[in-house]
Amino acid sequence: RCPFFYFSDMVLAETTCDGKKKMYELMSELKHCHIMQLPPGKTGRGALEFWKQEVISVKEDLEDFYHIRITDEQIRKAIHLRNRERKAVLDFFEIGRLKPTPITGYEINTVISSNEFTVDLEEKIKYLEHRTAELKELYEKEYKGKPSRPRVLITGCPTTGVIDKIVRQIEELGADVVGFENCCGPREKKDPIDETKDPITAIAEKYLRVNCSVMSPNPGRLEALDAQIDEYQVDGVVEVLLQACHTFAIESDAIRTFVTKEKGLPYIAINTDYSSGDQAQINTRLGAFIEMLG
């Protein structure tokens, strides 16, 4: 059970995945739900203004529900704090750029996901900054100049629910997962909210820029993948496709073509779910893939 849902007064949701949209209808029977309606694309006429009104609607619902008033100055302070958090998370993710990496992809994924349960953002920032500094020191003392194992980048769907069957398995088979170009990776963290603009407008602009597969078209994902492959010195790409996420599945053909043709790297797509029934098959395919990486 999710502790957030149990202890929450209301749920803030958005219309990304179709399954989630229907789930929120059921959740609304238990909690007050505010559902933000996403525009179908980033660049369509009126997309930004539409999304800005959705952000305003959230603010108004929070004020009505909690009987409070949210000022622009309070929003600016929250933006500044969240930008600091983004920087701390991004710096931690980018430890994977070191070669050889002093941290496993399993730890990266676990630390980031577990810290989402930290309510005190100052505490979260402090922990991540401290752990990042520790890992940089460890790299200088014990890893720098040593041979590196094959370096794998994960792309596609969120990996939190399949971390053991995919991320851990890759590393047990002899490769290092050094980066994540997916929903739980540094994608959103690289782009802070503009602190010089009207706060509502800045929030709307920032979240409309996220390279999510539900947006059509979504060229920013290829640009981000291109940069991350180079920055992390990647040897191969593993795309995780959860069975219910059709938008990522559709994009996978373009991703495969880009990785193999444009970047000249090995690529494999793993179609899976949260069950363990396909573990043996995944192990076999990942084992063969990692052998290709040398």
For each feature predicted by the language model, list its residue ranges.
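A charged, amphipathic alpha-helical module
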Residues: 56, 60-189
